[in-house]
Amino acid sequence: MSYQPQTEAATSRFLNVDEGGRTLRIHINDCGDGKETVVMLHGSGPGATGWANFSRNIDPLVEAGYRVLLLDCPGWGKSDAIVNSGSRSDLNARILKSVVDQLGIDKVHLLGNLMGGHSAVAFTLSWPERVAKLVLMGGGTGGMSLFTPMPTEGIKLLNALYREPTIENLKKMMSIFVFDTRDLTEALFEARLNNMLSRRDHLDNFVKSLEANPKQFPDFGPRLGEISAPTLIVWGRNDRFVPMDAGLRLLAGIAGSELHIYRDCGHWAQWEHADSFNQLVLNFLARA
């Protein structure tokens, strides 16, 4: 029987998760039924969702025999909003722990982009026995760059978009989000803008969280040596959101890790170089 592509609607489900005495309704997409599970964690951009971030990567993994979970972190997608005054990455890690516990999944491969990479590291540091392999793209430490003024131009545009969610500001941010802008269609802009404007509580949640704690993503650099899970680091040479030397920090800090750099690639390697990225990840996961 030929493979049937996954759809957002058919894989959509909700779980109730306790966070500090409050019940949060968390949205996931649960794709495939393989024995090994890959959890994909999205970035922090306005309007981001698990499905939107990884739409070009889901089917190759499911077709290869993996179960794929896409988590909408609190404050994004269809999940509830929450104003966070602590570490956003540790919050996401706790939510993910509750999700996989409810689903009866013991061990996972974690794949995360920007905030998702940082949250994957937070999860690994808290529950190392639950992580099989790590794939980190454009994020993971939260530390300062040695070569690029911080915050970067990309992060400045991202924060401006949260405060003024207009199509003009969205296009400004996306124009440096990827290296080759020819794939940035009007349909993509409209979908992302609709995601943002349909959940203004999520926009407010992020702004208020930053006001409560500007350092939502702490520097995990000093603790990277605690990570023993096999780790693949993927970066775009032209990333204008998180400088490439952050990837070198991960490489230096995580024993046995490997770094793959894409030339002519911005912050969205899994989307900009999807075919190559998918094969890279499949080869990495298949290794003994």
Curated annotation (Swiss-Prot):
GO cellular component terms given for this protein: cytoplasm
Pfam families for the chain: Abhydrolase_1
Entry's EC annotation: 3.7.1.14
UniProt catalytic activity: (2Z,4E)-2-hydroxy-6-oxonona-2,4-dienedioate + H2O = (2Z)-2-hydroxypenta-2,4-dienoate + succinate + H(+); (2Z,4E,7E)-2-hydroxy-6-oxonona-2,4,7-trienedioate + H2O = (2Z)-2-hydroxypenta-2,4-dienoate + fumarate + H(+)
One MF term in the entry's GO annotations: 2-hydroxy-6-oxonona-2,4,7-trienedioate hydrolase activity
Pathway stated in the Swiss-Prot or TrEMBL entry: Aromatic compound metabolism; 3-phenylpropanoate degradation
Keyword line: Aromatic hydrocarbons catabolism, Hydrolase
InterPro entries for the chain: AB_hydrolase_1, AB_hydrolase_fold, Epox_hydrolase-like, MhpC_alpha/beta_hydrolase
Top-level enzyme category: hydrolase
Keyword DNA damage appears in the UniProt entry: no
BP-aspect Gene Ontology terms: 3-phenylpropionate catabolic process
Annotated site (Catalytic role in ketonization of the dienol substrate (substrate destabilization)): R192
Active-site residue list: H267
Functional note: Catalyzes the cleavage of the C5-C6 bond of 2-hydroxy-6-oxononadienedioate and 2-hydroxy-6-oxononatrienedioate, a dienol ring fission product of the bacterial meta-cleavage pathway for degradation of phenylpropionic acid.
Subunit structure: Homodimer.
Family (UniProt): Belongs to the AB hydrolase superfamily. MhpC family.
Record protein name field: 2-hydroxy-6-oxononadienedioate/2-hydroxy-6-oxononatrienedioate hydrolase
Gene: mhpC
